[in-house]
Structure formats: C-alpha cells, structure tokens
C-alpha cells in the first residue's frame, strides 16, 4: 500500500512539475539570459498546427542561419491559439501578451524584439506610411523579407553580409 501511495505521489508531483510555464516565466528567463549575454530577446508566438511557424523555426535553425540569430538574440517561443485537444500546450498568459503587442489581430507566427530589460524594439507588423500594418509572420515575399531585415538591422549587430545571407534564405520561403 505504501508503495502504491509513493507511486501516486510521484505521479502527482511529476504532473505538477510538467505544467507548461507561464508566459511571464518564459519572458523573465529569456530576459535574464539576454542580460547575462548582452543580447536582445526575439519572442515568437506559435502553435503546433501552424505551418508558417514551423517554416520560420526551420529557417532560423538551419546550420548557416542559427549562429547568426543566436549571437544576437535569445530566441523564445510562446504557444497560443492551440486546437481544443492541445490547449495544454499553451503558455498561460501568452494570449494576453500577444494582445498587448497587437499580435492578436493578424495571425501567427507573430514575433517581436525587446532589449534585455524588456523594452520594445520592433515587431512583425510592417510599417506602411508611418503606421503599423499587417503581420509579415514568416517573411517570404520581397517586401516581407525586406521588413524582416529592417528589424534585424535595427535590433542586432548583424553586418551587411550576414543580413544578405538571411535575406536570401528567407526569400526561399515563397
């Protein structure tokens, strides 16, 4: 009986510890790491069903791309908008963060960049005529990729050659 009780207690403890972290906890961890490493934070909202989210992750994690992003950013993900059977994957509070940054109106992936203190730098809503416009998400068209490069130039130490490599790679997303 004690053995079964021990197993039950262990399972409850494991289940409690395995809960999806809150959006606040994810962002605090990323900011602490960015502060320690002298980087900015790149936050991407995604979901398990989102093909464009997977495409963006794949592009950013390719062997030629990953070092360019990782030397400049702590990249973190917040899961939102999951289907009914996968709501457990969502980070509690991530929907509120998405809305706070205006990403709740344009689909995912939605991303934004902050400095290590959480000060906003830029997001995935392109600027048209001096105003925020639609979400470029995973950049693929010439205009979307140009905007992505603008954000990277503004928020990183990437040089022109590195930015050209990133541009060429993301244009392959079409």
Which sequence ranges carry the predicted segments?
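C-terminal partner/receptor-binding element of secreted or periplasmic proteins
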Residues: 147-174
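Conserved redox-active cysteine motifs that mediate thiol-disulfide chemistry
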Residues: 45-60
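A short beta-strand-turn-helix
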Residues: 23-41
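Bacterial Sec-dependent N-terminal signal peptides
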Residues: 1-21
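Intrinsically disordered, low-complexity boundary segments flanking structured domains
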Residues: 11, 59-65
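A conditional alpha-helix N-cap/helix-loop micro-motif detector
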Residues: 20-24, 91
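Hydrophobic beta-strand anchors of alpha/beta hydrolase catalytic cores
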Residues: 41-43, 50, 75, 111
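Thioredoxin-like thiol-disulfide oxidoreductase module
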Residues: 28-31, 63-66, 70-152
């Amino acid at each position: 009986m004690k053995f079964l009780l021990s197993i039950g207690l262990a399972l409850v403890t494991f289940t409690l510890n395995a809960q999806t972290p809150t959006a606040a906890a994810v962002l605090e961890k990323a900011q602490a790491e960015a502060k320690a490493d002298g980087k900015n934070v790149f936050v991407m909202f995604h979901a398990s069903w989102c093909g464009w989210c997977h495409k963006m992750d794949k592009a950013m994690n390719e062997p030629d791309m990953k070092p360019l992003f990782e030397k400049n950013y702590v990249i973190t993900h917040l899961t939102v908008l999951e289907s009914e059977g996968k709501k457990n994957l969502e980070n509690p509070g991530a929907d509120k963060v998405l809305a706070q940054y205006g990403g709740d109106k344009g689909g995912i992936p939605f991303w934004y960049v902050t400095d290590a203190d959480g000060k906003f730098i830029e997001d995935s809503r392109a600027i048209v005529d001096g105003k925020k416009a639609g979400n470029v998400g995973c950049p693929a068209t010439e205009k979307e990729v140009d905007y992505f490069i603008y954000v990277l130039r503004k928020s990183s130490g990437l040089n022109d050659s590195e930015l050209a490599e990133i541009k060429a790679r993301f244009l392959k997303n079409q």
